[in-house]
Amino acid sequence: MRQSHQLPLMGLLLFSLIPRQQCEICEVSKENYTALNPLISTMINSKYNKGIQAANVLLSLRLGGFLSQSQDQQLTEKVLLATRSTEPSLTSGQLALAILAVGACKGPDGISKTSSELVRDLENKFQTEIKNMEEHDGNPLTNYYQLSLDVLALCLFRGKYSIRKVAEIFKPGNKNYYFHEQFSVDTGAMAVLALTCVKEKITRRQNQTDRKAIKNIVNHTKSLVNEILFQKTENGLLGNIYSTGEAMQALFVSPTYYNENQWDCQKTRDRVLAEISQGAFRMPTAAAQILPALMGKTYLDVNKDSSCVYGSDSFNISTQEPVSVTPAVSPSEIEVYYSVVINNQIDNTTVSVPNGSVFLDVMEQAEKENATRFSTLLAIYISRQGLKKKFHSRGELMGPLHHLCSGHKGQHQ
């Protein structure tokens, strides 16, 4: 009998579903690394680079290989200490981000710092998110940006999750992809990264139902990529300047879902570099989210089995303050209105803060004016006016607000 040269069905499925690598990822050349100085300085020197908030910074700088060994060790220990001491109160996305950061690579001792205990804790938090969706009209405890981080971390660190459930909840068109009826580009981008990881981790042991789920995941990914590209602006940005970094990552890992003429990567990169020179990334979270893409990296490059790459003399971290550009017309103070929803009870307030403030400043001012109403927040709904320029994306909200659980509609039980 002649031997068959046909691939097994599952092998063929694997071959057809895993996208080819893009021929060119438009990272910044080594000759232009100095253009990244403002980002590095912002991340390392910021007053918000503390505790769990440092996870975003650690992840970004590790992917870029910019930290010295001592800086890496110091920042890793800071994130680990904050994670372990506050884990019960962390949102699922915060814990996922910490796991990605401390497990992004292994240190000189050859050990990855991410523990199986943290991964199990994330599994439980993710299941709590799913349960809340089932009980509250599809609303997670946090939002889809954080749910995507959950799936990504569980996927990369061999946590437990249901492929079928992932395929079910991440359908395109789901209301959780939208913020004030506007598609959230960074939420969609994070979902693409998570779905791509799930798709690439399939094995021969998957059953027929899981194969169907994988096919759905492929279709979901393609739809989300198309939605991201639909948000492309004339100047090359994907959504806006703050969502562009993670959107670039999403497009890096999904080149088979769009044509080359649909996206000019170099145009996007050059626009981002121009924005950096104008001081667009003054917050460490924003800087951390844009840096990996400029280095040609994505969160899928996280690998707990790979040795960390440390900075060399070819890149000098500047201690100079990042450039800050003030608009021609800029009032010294702005008025911000927001409302807090706790168990369907709504508290509203209006506070005045200096122009350029972050949302954490708004909350601190509200607490000063009425500590009884605003000192403890389990859930928030943000109605943005004066700070609209500052918070363009879900990812940014996770930056200075790491100690809060921000949900799509502020519904937390």
PLM feature spans:
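An alpha-helical repeat/solenoid feature that recognizes helix-turn-helix modules
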Residues: 2-19, 45-69, 87-112, 134-166, ...
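Buried hydrophobic core positions in alpha-solenoid tandem helical repeats
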Residues: 39-43, 79-83, 122, 166-174, ...
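Ubiquitin-like/PB1-type beta-grasp interaction modules and other compact soluble beta-rich domains
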Residues: 9-16, 124-125, 129-139, 152-155, ...
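Eukaryotic modular interaction domains in large regulatory/scaffold proteins
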Residues: 223, 227, 249-253, 268-271, ...
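Helix-turn-helix repeat elements of alpha-solenoid scaffolds
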Residues: 28-35, 68-77, 112-125, 161-165, ...
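N-terminal signal peptide
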Residues: 2, 12-37
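Extracytoplasmic low-complexity, Pro/Thr/Ser/Ala/Gly-rich segments
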Residues: 28-62, 334-342, 351-355
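Alpha-helical scaffold repeats of the Armadillo/HEAT/TPR superfamily
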Residues: 114-124, 209-220, 264-271, 306-319
